[in-house]
């Protein structure tokens, strides 16, 4: 199972609208980690080129990575986050509205069958040193064997796109305990990406996001949304009653989920006012 901790407003969108919202990673705390990943790959590749005496190619590579970083919004990825941990205190506190929210469990095997193209289900990896990352050798080999290195090489740009995609699933090792997975959309890798973006307008700002149609994705496997959901856990500090939530699910046409509700057993304390 993959566990998605959220608040009840987002839960309503998932259940009633069958829509999973994927938000821009650059608007999340993870933006700095994407940059950390790209800078780490760049340093590992240029160090390796310098050691091989390819000083000019190393310089050009560093300059190209620098230019790419300035265009990071073009490479924006959009994600929804999950954890392998059920009823976890840290997840409730960080992502489940301080325990007042709700957790939806999704069947991982079914989600894997539903994705493809610009949509990927990625396990987050936590790595401090990039020198051992497979992309380093791929960049190094391509640049080393090219007689005249140019950032306009299609193979080089493809590798750069792959680096941006993988950066969306990178986090600092201090977050290893989260055991996170991400459902990631990378619109920049496909000209035929069929999902139209939407915008959430708040008093403070306008945010862009991509809505995944869960009914459509389930329909590809001849499944119903209720088949995708394994259980629903009410947060440890939530005042939500099970009978009201059962009525809500019935009114949404999801009677099959009524018996999959449970209360959290996590001993998280209610926030003090």
Residue ranges: model-predicted function:
Residues 1-273:
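Partner-binding and oligomerization surfaces adjacent to conserved cores of proteins
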């Amino acid at each position: 199972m993959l566990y998605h901790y959220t608040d009840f407003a987002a839960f309503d969108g998932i259940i009633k609208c069958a829509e999973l919202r994927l938000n821009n990673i650059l608007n999340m705390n993870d933006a700095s980690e994407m940059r950390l990943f790209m800078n780490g790959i760049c340093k590992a590749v240029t160090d390796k080129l310098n050691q091989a005496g390819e000083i000019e190619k190393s310089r050009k590579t560093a300059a190209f990575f620098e230019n790419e970083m300035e265009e990071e919004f073009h490479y924006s990825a959009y994600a929804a986050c999950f954890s392998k941990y059920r009823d976890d205190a840290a997840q409730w506190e960080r992502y489940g509205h301080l325990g007042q929210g709700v957790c939806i469990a999704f069947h991982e095997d079914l989600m894997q069958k539903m994705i493809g193209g610009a949509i990927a289900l990625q396990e987050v990896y936590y790595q401090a040193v990039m020198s051992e990352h497979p992309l380093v050798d791929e960049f190094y080999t391509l640049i080393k064997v090219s007689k005249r290195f140019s950032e306009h090489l299609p193979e080089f740009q493809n590798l750069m796109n792959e680096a941006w995609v993988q950066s969306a699933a990178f986090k600092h090792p201090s977050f290893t305990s989260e055991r996170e997975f991400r459902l990631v959309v990378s619109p920049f890798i496909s000209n035929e990406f069929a999902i139209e973006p939407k915008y959430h307008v708040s008093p403070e700002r306008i945010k862009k996001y991509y809505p995944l149609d869960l009914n459509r994705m389930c329909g590809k496997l001849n499944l119903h949304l209720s088949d995708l959901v394994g259980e629903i856990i009410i947060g440890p500090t939530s005042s939500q009653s099970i009978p009201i939530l059962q009525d809500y699910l019935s009114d949404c046409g999801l009677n099959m989920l009524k018996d999959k509700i449970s209360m959290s057993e996590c001993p998280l304390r209610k926030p003090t006012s």
